[in-house]
Amino acid sequence: MVEIHVQRTIAAPVEKVFDWLADPHALTAAPLVLRAGYTKDSSPPGPGAVREVVALGTWFREQITAFDRPRSYTYLILRSFPPFNHEGGTLTFTPAGNGTHVDWLTTYTHPARAGGNLLAAVTRPLLRSNFLAILAACAKTLEI
């Protein structure tokens, strides 16, 4: 099982950080992401909302499974290429001094037919670096 855990404290109010990171368009701050957004048939932002992410060599269809603004939200990959067995991802937002501490945790495996551990050895560092790039872009955009 792969676990990716990244954290960053951003010098901006928790509500602004939450809103920025909960917007699927923020995912385009990742170097490999070409486009991201809610699907045409998605419910409004919140539980049940479905977003699609298209990146170099991959795509994801994710559903927001929990949405507690401005404290946390959780998502689950429903479909993807390459395939993921996703246990879920959660972003947690905690006030920290004059800013917000963001904790992002996701866990997954790849089925053996898709490359299993070999594919995980490739996706783990790629996804981790993209998560960090998204958090860095949030900080660059919002920090006072």
What are these regions (language model features)?
Residues 1-43:
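Hydrophobic ligand-binding cavity/cleft-lining segments
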Residues 6-8, 61-66, 87-95, 106:
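Hydrophobic/aromatic beta-strand elements that line small-molecule binding cavities or substrate pockets
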Residues 10, 79, 106-108:
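Hydrophobic beta-strand positions in extracellular immunoglobulin-like domains
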Residues 17-21, 27, 51, 64, ...:
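Hydrophobic pocket/interface hotspot
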Residues 37-82, 96, 133-144:
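Glycine-rich portal/gate segments that line the openings of hydrophobic small-molecule binding cavities
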Residues 56, 81-85, 110-114:
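Short, cysteine-centered beta-strand-loop-beta hairpins and adjacent loop/turn segments enriched
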Residues 97-101:
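Glycine-rich nucleotide-binding loop
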Residues 108-144:
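A conserved amphipathic terminal alpha-helix motif
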